[in-house]
Amino acid sequence: MPGVMIVEDDAALRELLRDALEKRKYTVITAADGREALAKFRPSVVDVVITDLLMPEEDGLMVIMKIRELKPSAKLIAISGGGMAGPGSYLLMASKLGADAVISKPFLPSELVQKVKELLS
């Protein structure tokens, strides 16, 4: 099955998303921040990266830029509570940096799983 990396500093949300994806037989790697994500990222294993945008250490925008360099074909999903309002919103910046999809918090895990499925089809 395809590999998915979840980069999220909220431990409860990270585990909720992991469970939802593993139930659909995805291989899941998790990281609590951008620095950990970049240390764990393996292009041969990870097909989709789901990253929160506001995190300590390396933020999600940096993760998007670096993953795009390491594996241009990776699908990138940005998640944030910042929403899409305004020209300076984090989700809008993520789109401009190459995120394939953006999802505003709160969302249902099933919505995210569906987006992963769509991006991989």
Each model region followed by its residue ranges:
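Conserved acidic carboxylate
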Residues: 8
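Charged docking surfaces used in two-component/phosphorelay signaling
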Residues: 15-23
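Short hydrophobic/Thr-rich beta-strand motif most characteristic of the beta2 strand and flanking loop
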Residues: 25-32, 40
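Acidic catalytic/metal-coordinating carboxylates
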Residues: 33-36, 59-62
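Active-site residues of response regulator receiver
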Residues: 52
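Receiver (REC) domain active-site loop signature in two-component systems and cognate sites
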Residues: 55
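Alpha4 helix (beta4-alpha4-beta5 surface) of REC/receiver domains from two-component response regulators
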Residues: 62, 83-103, 110, 114
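Hydrophobic/aromatic residues positioned on beta-strands within the core alpha/beta folds
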Residues: 79-81
